[in-house]
Amino acid sequence: MTTRQLSEFGNFKCFKSRCSFRSLTTLSALAACAAALAVTPTARAQSCVGDLNGDRIVNGPDLGILLGQWEQVGPGDLDGNGVVDGADLGIMLGAWGRCAVTVPSWATLVEAMPDPAVVTDSTLRAAISASGLAWRVLDTATQMEMLLVPPGTFTMGCTTSNAFGCVSNENPTHLVTLTQPFYMGRYEVTQLQWVVRMASNPSSFQGYSDSANRPVEQVSWTTIQGYLSSTGMRLPSEAEWEFACRAGTTTAFNNGSSDDPTVDTIAWYVSNAGNQTHAVGGKAANSLGLHDMSGNVWEWVNDWFDGGYYSVSPSTNPLGPVSGSYRVLRGGSWRFSTDFVRSSYRSINSPGNTLNNIGFRVARNP
């Protein structure tokens, strides 16, 4: 299509650079104008003018809203002249496509919008897109890959598998709302990533050809704080961790099943790990694209532990008890059965302790 291409449909004319209107007669004319404008989904101004339904894309549904308000007052009045008319339609068509995303100052963009082959849950994809933040980024300083976890509401707590029930500290189940998006490491922190920052390797599983890409372990909650302060990262809260692990599922395991044998596809655990850790990312990701949320190594989260906390937990952005003797661990590990890799299972340890099946995953604010 040339830079200046004209399509004429009765009293409706459309140029590549602008549209003019003698009268508005049919939706087919509008569609033809859109075609003449070659309106493909591309990033645009951050203001996202014309996105009337808030899904971060200016497209057919927004056009329908605007036409439904024709010659009336409404959100479709994009130029603010008091009436929805042809000028507003021209603005919308000129802004057609995806809204631009915000890339955090600490990050390097990899992919702006969620890949449906990775973020397989359509509700999560829509929530990520609606956030206005880039989906997949690298932390520039560490080159660690991070994925956006959108805000959302979920039921936190006990989900039984076909073979195992819950323990008391997984109850009562309760609704939790996370109001802010955050970034989560796509993988557990590896031995190499730890060594680059901390100049030593505490891990038990060194000396293998893939050791650099195995999760770092033998790291205490207390020691991890030095790594976090040097990188600007943080540990996820327990609620953030479970929301990210579940990735829209309500089943025992984050693959959408409560059938214990299916764990083999998503987790390194006692029956398939061969008494050792494995390189991160070797098992299937969950519906947010996060790997090893179940199995491989336990993951420290930020919260103190209190077995009765779920009974008094705030429903919005819970951060755990204000004090305690133990910190929470999540996700199970290579040493444990399917019971422990359930999305709701909670374990604990003293913050100064280390074990060869305990590691961590980072989070970061946008």
Cite the ranges covered by each PLM segment.
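Short aromatic-cysteine micro-motif
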Residues: 137-143, 167-249, 271-292, 366
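Short, compositionally biased
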Residues: 2, 24-39, 43-51, 101-200, ...
